[in-house]
Design a protein with these regions (language model features):
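Conserved ATP-driven motor cores of ASCE-family P-loop NTPases powering translocation/secretion/packaging/pilus
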Residues: 1-71, 169-170, 184, 237-243, ...
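Hydrophobic alpha-helical segments, principally membrane-spanning helices and signal/leader peptides
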Residues: 202-203, 229, 296, 306
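Short glycine-rich, low-complexity/disordered patches
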Residues: 37, 72-87, 191-206
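C-terminal regions of RecA-like/P-loop NTPase motor modules
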Residues: 57-100, 107, 128-130, 313-315
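Short small/polar-residue motifs
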Residues: 24, 87-93, 111, 284-289
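P-loop NTPase catalytic phosphate-binding loop
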Residues: 1-16, 29, 93-196, 204-277
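Helix N-terminus capping/helix-initiation residues
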Residues: 14, 34, 88, 92, ...
Length: 315
């Protein structure tokens, strides 16, 4: 502004902004339409007038906009995206069952998704960072899928989603039945693909099937519940992933320290959601984010090396 000799300041909400434009003045700018301060050699007060009365100005502008819209049959450009103060569930819901929405990207204000066709997705964060909330958000978008749920000690998922699950368990006794159902599903997919493998790829075949997702709230507990079928699970997991069955697992940063094959397979992820302070976990490689302060309802969606900060709706 210092490059401009003559300056005019109309009404501004913050009076210090007026001072920054024209400098000190003996006049106080009143809340009168058209009243302004003008700086020539010194600061004076003036009244601005319009050349016409501008009757029905807003209505005429709206009519002109409508007329232009009707005349233009081309694709309308995207509007300027603005991050809402509160992100709600309906803002991130996906129209595809194989890619549930997680949150709004804080840079581009676009929905970020997880791709669910035969992958392991990790939701990692300390207690109280919103891991179960993310699982609930995903389950809200899987009501047309076949879902297997292994719940936490608190049974938070069971209270709302037990009835929609093909199989639900949170004890060691039911782990055998869980394995048998999964084994049957994989065997069915293998035999079905044998019939059509000359006509389509395995990926194309899996995309045509009902989406099957295993949702685990507390992966460490899941491993303990499945200790009697651990060896069988170690063999089954690679096969079920190959045939399009996905796993979504919640984990805290200090878990999965074992060296058994099942733990190794469940740690081998390249997609997921990081909650809390990114540096506090080592499962998903993240760039250093200095002075990051975690706020509930925020996180990072990670997909094959691409990381997006997102605002996540709370359920």
């Amino acid at each position: 502004l210092n490059n401009f000799k003559n300056k005019i300041a109309g009404y501004l909400f913050d009076k210090t902004d007026i001072l920054g434009i024209v400098g000190r003045s003996k006049y106080q700018l009143p809340e009168i339409k058209g009243r302004a301060l003008i700086k020539l050699d010194e600061v004076d007060i003036m009244q601005c007038y319009t050349p016409v009365e501008f009757e029905n100005y807003t209505e005429n502008i709206e009519a002109l906009i409508k007329e232009l819209n009707m005349a233009n049959l081309g694709k309308k450009p995207d509007g300027i995206r603005v991050m809402p103060e509160i992100v709600t569930v309906d803002m991130v819901l996906s129209d595809r069952i194989d890619r549930p929405g997680i949150g709004l990207d804080t840079d581009e204000i676009e929905v970020q998704y997880l791709e669910l066709c035969g992958n392991i997705h990790m939701v990692v964060g300390k207690e109280g960072t919103g891991k179960t909330n993310v699982l609930k958000l995903i389950l809200e978008q899987l009501k047309e899928a076949e879902v297997y749920i292994c719940d936490s000690v608190g049974s938070e998922l069971g209270r709302e989603y037990k009835d929609m699950a093909k199989f639900y368990f949170n004890n060691e006794v039911d782990s055998g039945a869980f394995y048998k159902l999964l084994e049957d599903e994989v065997s069915l997919r293998v035999s079905e693909y044998e019939r059509v493998k000359n006509d389509k790829s395995l990926r194309e075949f899996c995309m045509e099937l009902t989406q099957v997702v295993i949702v685990i709230d507390d992966i460490e507990r899941f491993i303990n519940l499945c200790k009697d079928i651990r060896t069988d699970l170690e063999k089954l997991i690679p096969k079920l992933l190959d045939y399009g069955i996905s796993i979504v697992e919640a984990v805290t940063p200090n878990e999965l320290r074992g060296f058994d094959e099942l733990t190794k397979k469940l740690k081998d992820v390249n997609s997921g959601v990081v909650l809390g302070i990114p540096d506090e976990q080592s499962f998903i490689r993240m760039p250093v984010i200095r002075n990051y302060k975690f706020v509930i309802g925020t996180g990072f969606v990670f997909k094959g090396g691409d990381i997006k900060k997102v605002k996540i709706p709370l359920i």
